[in-house]
Amino acid sequence: MKRIPDAVFLDRDGTVMEDAHYIKSPDQVRLIPGAAAAVKRINDAGVPAIVVTNQSGIARGIFTVADYEAVRSHFESLLQAHGAHIDASYYCPHHPTITGACDCRKPATRMFEGAIRDFALDPKKVAYVGDRWRDVVASKKLGGRGIMISSHMTTDEDRRRAQADGIETAASLGHAVEMLFDLTETPRSA
């Protein structure tokens, strides 16, 4: 029997918001067409929509934590203008060649584990949606359902790894949300 997830972990750049490569200013924020409606569908189901994002521009000195927070705030206000909201945001400010290895930068799982703890979630009952393999592979490490969507940042290597790991794919966030919230059973072939 299919069931809706208890929470949806969303990558930000390339999944909900257009990836303009190191977004450091609110005026660079653009929602991906259809993304606000997809987040609203998650909200309307009473399911937490939780952003989990790598932000190595902080470690690289391209933008500051304050810049990140200004972008996050504007991003969330754009969603709110469409009746959608994000329940929480988790970010990793590190980059391995600058700050050294960390346990929060995706594909590591610490940010997800923090959200699972903070929201008292069963990791086997959550969904992970992102445009890169590293955004969704936590579904294999922690449990749950991973769906990789396609963006201009999705590489052939991402696709190969997702296929090898048995991670589902979708054309967009809207399509991924349809997959997560469509509870009809798919007929089996004879």
Residue ranges and their predicted role:
Residues 103-136:
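Conserved Lys-Pro-Asp/Glu-containing loop-to-beta segment of HAD-superfamily phosphomonoesterases
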Residues 1-50:
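Active-site neighborhood of HAD-like aspartate-dependent phosphohydrolases
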Residues 61-76, 100-114, 142-144:
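Short, electropositive alpha-helical surface patch
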Residues 128-168:
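Acidic, Mg2+-coordinating phosphoryl-transfer loop and its flanking beta/alpha structural elements
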Residues 167-176:
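Short acidic-hydrophobic, aromatic-tinged amphipathic segments that line or gate anion-handling sites
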Residues 25, 57-62, 95-101, 156-159:
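A short acidic, helix-capping loop that chelates divalent metal ions and anchors anionic groups
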Residues 1-12, 178-190:
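Non-catalytic pre-domain segments flanking phosphatase-related domains
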Residues 35, 39-72, 85-95:
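Substrate-recognition element of Asp-dependent hydrolases with the DxDx(T/V) motif
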